[in-house]
Structures are given as C-alpha cells and as structure tokens.
Amino acid sequence: MKIKAAAVVLIFLAAGLLFDTGLAQGIRKPVWAGQFYESDPTRLAYLIDSFLQAANPSSVQGQIVGLVSPHAGYIYSGQIAAHGYQLVRNLDISTVVIIGPSHQVGFEGCSIYLKGSFQTPLGLAAVAEILAG
C-alpha cells in the first residue's frame, strides 16, 4: 500500500514538473536563463553580438561539417564559442543538433525532446521533429 501511495505522489510530482517546464504545451521553458546566460533579450543579444564582434578566428582549410562548442555559462565560454560560430555564420545551415548533459536529473542513456520548441530569451527554437522522432 505504501508503494502505491508513493507511486501516486511521484506521478503527481512528475506531472507538475511537466507543466512547470511547459512540456504539456510542447514548449520547453528555459531553466537556466538568468543564471548561465542573460534572461533579458536585449542584454543577451548585446552580449552575443559583443562576443561575435570580438571573435577573429583563423581561417579553416576545407569544408566545415560540424562544430563542437562549449556550453558553459556565457561569462566563461561565450567568447570561445563565438570563434566557432563566426566560422559558420555565413554558411547555409538548416538544422543544428545540440548535445549536452542534463544539469537537473542524472540518468543513463540520452534524452531526446521529440516535438515542440525550446523557449529562449530570444524566441522559440523549434525541434526538428522528423530527425528527433
């Protein structure tokens, strides 16, 4: 009986998390905005533009087919990331695959957000549902 009660409580808690993060509406709310990066769109855009303007990466011989970029807080890794993004800024890129660790829950394997969008301070980033599914 205690196990059933605990299971019911866990289900309600999990459902609450879905609504808090916007998963029920298909929009994943930002969890770290204001901590790892600016939550204010104007300030975030200015910070990103500043990093990109200061970046002057060396040219790359050959075709760029992928980019590995740090994902730490922008104050720590933004300038380094900007060097990579400057290299691909003018390329015709239709899909970006973002791979990163979970900072909220530990688990084995991987998790793929199958459909919807990620809310960012700069707007929605749609999931490529055909690739995700």
Enumerate the language-model features and the residues they cover.
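Bacterial N-terminal signal peptides
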Residues: 8-18
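Active-site histidine-anchored catalytic micro-motif
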Residues: 25-133
